[in-house]
Amino acid sequence: MRKMMETITIFDDVFVPNDRIFMDGDTEAAGTLALTFVEYHRFTAVSYKLPLVDALGGCAALAADYNGILGVTHVREKFIDLIDYAETTRALLEKSAERCIAKPNGQVAPDPMTVNLAKSHFAHGYHEAVQHVQEIAGGILVTGPGDEDWESEELRPFLQKYLAGRDGVSGEQRMKLLNFVRDLTSSDYGAYQEVLAIHAEGSLQAERLQVFRAFNENGGARRVMRLAGRMAGVR
């Protein structure tokens, strides 16, 4: 559907053998099973998104260089924001693995608090990251010439001249980079990734809810109550 690997799967009068039924009326375990899936799902989500985030940072650096604006203050600030975004997301993901929780059966799961923070940080920051890259690259992302223009013997010399970047960067070299940036940020694929950032592997609010639950489970409020009691001389 829409050129992406997505389907609508309909189960209509499907027979399921008894040996393939894993939860037969065990409703109390349903919530635990769902939440266990959530932590793994959030972990894999951030893991496979990090290369895309790194690519955005690389695109911004190259686009700024090719456009001759790498030394401009506000461009450097945007690039620093992209580094901050990528490395904070990575640090939270790695920390969720370091804080992993071992179950009695030997199964290991990511730390619920940290892995949801990682996913939330990624999702909340993705659109701003794309915006930074688009701003650095320029509006030519969507107005640049197509293949037929470059293949024209009449037009090609003009394109090479007027679309060139800083000294040493030809028009063709610059446009190859900008076409890649367009594919990541301004195409059907780019829009698809922006929607995924919001909804895939859990919505923004779902992640925040899990962070809140994990905070309560970690006993943050109970610790404060104990400290407040000690300060007031109450045990």
Where are these regions (language model features)?
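Glycine-rich beta->alpha junctions and the first turn(s) of the following alpha-helix
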Residues: 1-86
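Short acidic (Asp/Glu) and glycine-rich catalytic loops that position anionic groups and cofactors
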Residues: 34-41, 98-108
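A structural signal for long alpha-helical coiled-coils and helix-turn connectors
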Residues: 61-68, 97, 101, 137
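Short, charged, amphipathic alpha-helical segments
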Residues: 76-80, 108-116
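Loop-to-helix element that buttresses phosphate recognition and phosphoryl-transfer chemistry
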Residues: 80-102, 121-124, 128, 134
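Alpha-helix capping/hinge segments and adjacent helical runs
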Residues: 113-235
